[in-house]
Design a protein with these regions (language model features):
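C-terminal boundary of histidine-terminating zinc-finger modules
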Residues: 319-329
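Residue-level signature of catalytic and energy-coupling elements of molecular machines
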Residues: 12, 30, 66, 99, ...
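Phosphate-binding loop that captures ATP/GTP phosphates
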Residues: 125-191, 197
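N-proximal, solvent-exposed amphipathic alpha-helical segments enriched in charged/polar residues
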Residues: 1-34, 69
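Extreme N-terminal, non-catalytic leader segments
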Residues: 26-29, 37-41, 47-106
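Switch II (G3) loop of P-loop NTPases
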Residues: 155-158, 179-194, 201-229, 234
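Walker A/P-loop phosphate-binding motif and the immediately C-terminal alpha-helix
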Residues: 101-139, 248, 258, 267
Length: 345
């Protein structure tokens, strides 16, 4: 039996690309380079993206189909060659080359206002005239779409330099991306660690962030695979830790670990004191006084700022209007002061 290209194409036409209903030939995935020598054959398959999740299974199915239709005496020379239309994502360490400073916003535990700090710090930096991007890396509990009042936004992709790039949403002078834009807000995100990390890498490496002075990453509370993904994927400038005193040590120790080695830019004491609206000059230290200052001295890191408990912070966050937008308020001034302290670091 003689082999010729049409027999190979007929075999490949029985393999369908998942989710499209088209076979490999119809989908234009078989390059016109089929090479045959006796019973030896080699050819190339074309995929849209280098990260195509079906690449391995499709290649295996193509190989099996040829052997099934043309006989096991057929030898596929080497591996089936794979080519991609979309350019490959840059290597780790070369991502975001146009970003000057990459800062993680972290906390040792949840419920300390880390995301509030991240959102308002981003807005405050933008008000100071800097180009700012904010990535909501809290994959399992994204909050930035609500805090910026862009819950209905759906980022789209554009072809840039041969790659499909996600265009970040812009609000209050901040470029913003969150997994919350791509999932149903009423459904739990039931992903294993690897899936979450891959989604995060896409939001970092497959997005058109452009030139930025500051790229802030709102990390999940505690320590997790997401934190490791970020520090292994990006050249971090440093981290800002929102303080819940006992757990802040864990966050600091994670970043200063020899395997991670990300500088701590400083601490932010959120909920430092309570000031009621009717008594704006009063401060009630309901969680104790100077705890963050003592921790900063103990850990030899700066105390970048103190944010009071004020009803408007929560209310404005729920409305999607960060308090840092209004520099005439006590909280607005507090976040602008924090932004200036971060810049000095």
């Amino acid at each position: 039996m003689a082999l010729y290209p049409k027999l190979i194409l007929d075999a490949l036409a029985t393999v369908r690309y998942p989710g499209t209903g088209k076979n490999l030939v119809e989908a234009g995935m078989v390059e016109d380079d089929i090479r045959i020598e006796g019973m030896k054959v080699s050819f190339s398959l074309i995929f849209e993206k280098p990260t195509d999740p079906f690449m391995k299974s499709v290649v295996k199915a193509a190989e099996t189909s040829i052997l099934t239709h043309e006989g096991k005496e057929v030898e596929i020379v080497g591996n089936i060659s794979v080519k991609t239309v979309q350019a490959a994502r840059p290597e780790v360490g070369k991502l975001l080359p146009q970003v000057k400073n990459i800062i993680g916003i972290s906390s040792g535990k949840g419920g300390v206002g880390k995301s509030t700090v991240a959102a308002n710090l981003a807005v405050a930096l933008a008000k100071l005239g800097y180009k700012v991007g904010l990535l909501d890396a809290d994959i399992f509990g994204p909050s930035m779409p609500k805090m910026f009042q862009v819950e209905d936004a759906r980022p789209y992709a554009e072809k840039i330099d041969g790659r499909d790039m996600i265009i970040p949403v812009e609000k209050y002078g901040v470029k913003l991306l969150s997994i919350g834009f791509f999932v149903d807000p009423d459904q739990a995100t039931l992903w294993r660690g690897g899936m979450a990390s891959n989604a995060l890498k896409q939001l970092i490496g497959d997005a058109a962030w452009g030139e930025l002075d500051y790229f802030l990453i709102d990390l999940p509370p505690g320590t997790s695979d997401i934190h490791l993904t970020v520090v292994q994927t990006l050249a971090m400038t440093g981290a800002v830790v929102a303080v819940a005193l006992a757990d802040a040590r864990k966050g600091i120790n994670m970043f200063t670990n020899d395997k991670v080695n990300v500088p701590i830019l400083g601490l932010v004491e959120n909920m430092a004191w309570f000031t009621p609206a009717e008594l704006p000059d009063n401060k009630y230290y309901i969680f104790g006084r100077e705890g963050a200052k003592k921790l900063a001295e103990e850990m030899n890191v700066p105390l970048l700022g103190q944010i009071p408990i004020v009803q408007s912070i929560c209310e404005n966050g729920d409305k999607g209007t960060p308090v840092a937008l209004d520099e005439n308020t006590m909280t607005g001034r507090a976040f602008l002061s924090l932004a200036a302290a971060v810049v000095r670091q």
